[in-house]
């Protein structure tokens, strides 16, 4: 029971999703090869980054305890129900943070550690606080969400270059329509706690147009690894096909479907698209 509640506090779904994008960066750096040469490093960076993301999610839960208690989809979180206390959660999050730093420093490299720490700070210190204050919090949160593939890349090459920037842009532009789709689907919950989400402040129509704008930027960014010469033809074709397919389905839904169906369409295909792109990167 308690193990399950502590696991829920770390948001395993978010961890898993971020590890998929990390894999994309790792595969780009190794040209889609994870053999005996790279397998230990791959395991180490996965563990280190997973621990840091888990720590960030724990501290996010602590800060959001008050609004989580008022939203239907978050009312059963461990801190809200009292299964885990704030003190216990703080200790848990701190242990995860320390373990992550140790793994990344000793078993990966210092650059990757610093990159992941930046992601942690942006997520916990900037995004978590700013989402109560500004409609731009989702964009700020996109910075932290775009960090894992960069970390996967630097774990191998130990440098920041244009390929790392390309990975960052792909994930950053992907996250905005993905996140706004979630905001549209749970708009009633966000209204309850008076969070200034874009669909609430600017309206659904404006949000949908912005989602399509970022989707177009995402499609363009998917060509960058190939343009830079780091991704092969197979990766380029897969990336462009799935990105264009997502764009097509979203525009089609925008023209014909209700707002909720549009949000569901964008969200559903966002998961399929980013998984396909990350697992064929290289």
From Swiss-Prot:
Keywords: Cell inner membrane, Cell membrane, Heme biosynthesis, Membrane, Transferase, Transmembrane, Transmembrane helix. It catalyses: heme b + (2E,6E)-farnesyl diphosphate + H2O = Fe(II)-heme o + diphosphate. GO terms for cellular component: plasma membrane. Disulfide bonds: none annotated. GO terms for molecular function: protoheme IX farnesyltransferase activity. The chain crosses the membrane at residues 9-29, 39-59, 79-99, 102-122, 139-159, 165-185, 210-230, 231-251, 261-281. One of its GO terms (biological process) is heme O biosynthetic process. Pathway: Porphyrin-containing compound metabolism; heme O biosynthesis; heme O from protoheme: step 1/1. CDD domains: PT_UbiA_Cox10 (cd13957). NCBIfam families: cyoE_ctaB (TIGR01473), PRK04375.1-1 (NF003348). This is Protoheme IX farnesyltransferase. It comes from Francisella tularensis subsp. holarctica (strain FTNF002-00 / FTA).
